[in-house]
A protein has these predicted regions:
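A generic "alpha-helical surface" signal
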Residues: 18-21, 25, 51, 58
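Disorder-to-helix initiation segments
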Residues: 2-23
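Conserved alpha-helical segments that form or flank metal/cofactor-binding pockets of metalloenzymes
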Residues: 45-83
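Helix-loop segments that flank and shape redox-cofactor active sites
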Residues: 8-15, 30-55
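N-terminal intrinsically disordered, cationic/polar leader segments
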Residues: 24, 77-91
Length: 91
């Protein structure tokens, strides 16, 4: 972890990065699941559900990016592998 002077101890920053990586992992896996449903939706409500799921995964993408960037700003490293996502995820 690189040194960052933002008024938090290294322990506090490490704890925050750990939590952010958990959020990042859950968000990424949720995005994958949402895209899968988006691709597979059928039926009379196809258009509205398809659009809703697209909006959701686009919002998740923004959240994922912000979470990863915040982790870096705290001096940590955002998880970025399938193995890492599965390690930290709770969904």
């Amino acid at each position: 972890m690189r040194k960052v002077n933002i008024g938090l101890t290294q322990e506090q920053r490490q704890g925050s990065c750990e939590l952010l990586n958990r959020v990042l992992s859950d968000s990424y896996l949720l995005q994958i699941k949402t895209k899968k449903y988006h691709w597979d939706v059928t039926g009379p409500e196809f258009r509205s559900i398809h659009q809703l799921l697209q909006e959701q995964y686009e919002m998740l993408d923004e959240n994922i990016d912000a979470t990863a960037e915040r982790t870096r700003a705290l001096g940590g490293f955002p998880v970025g592998t399938a193995e890492g996502f599965l390690k930290y995820a709770s969904i």
